[in-house]
Amino acid sequence: MQETRVLVETGRTTGEETMSYWFDLPIDVAEFEEKLGVGAESRDYRIIEKVLPFADEVHEHTSVYQLNEFDFMYRQLVADMQEEYPMLLTVFENLEALYICRNVITVYPDCKNMIDVARQKLMNDPIFKHLSEDCQEYYFDFEAYASHLQEYGKFLVTEHGIFELPE
C-alpha cells in the first residue's frame, strides 16, 4: 500500500511559530484538533505538503473530512486499480468517478493483449461453458473474438494488465 500522508500547517501562530504536523491518512479528527489546536471544520489550517497517490485531488484548503473521504475511496479500489491509478485517470475524470465505477470494471491482471482477454473470457464466461474442450482448443477463433471484444468493448491496456471499462 502506498504511503498516504499530509503536512498540515495552522493559519494561526502560537507565539512566533506556525505549527505544522505530518498526519497519516485517515486522519483522526480528535488527534488533529489536539495537535494543531484548531477545529477540523475551521479554515485555520492548510495543506503544505502531501504524499498521496491522489495528490491532484487535494489542494491547500481541502478539509480533513474530504481527505479522509478521498483516502476511503482510494482504499476501496482493488490493488490492481491502485497500482494503475494514474493510467485509469486518463479515462476517468477523477477519483470519485473511478470509485463509483469500480465494481463494474473487470480486471485481467495476467493478460498482455486482447487474445489473452479472449482466452480468459472463454474460460470464465458461462456463455461458453457448453463448448467442449476440443472445440475451445481446436476450433475457437481467439483472434476474431479478440477483435470483436476490442471493437465493441472499451478496454484500457496497461503495463500490468487490461481493464474492461463500462461504456
Question: Where on the chain are the PLM-derived regions?
Answer:
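Mixed-charge (acidic/basic) macromolecular-recognition segments
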Residues: K35-P126
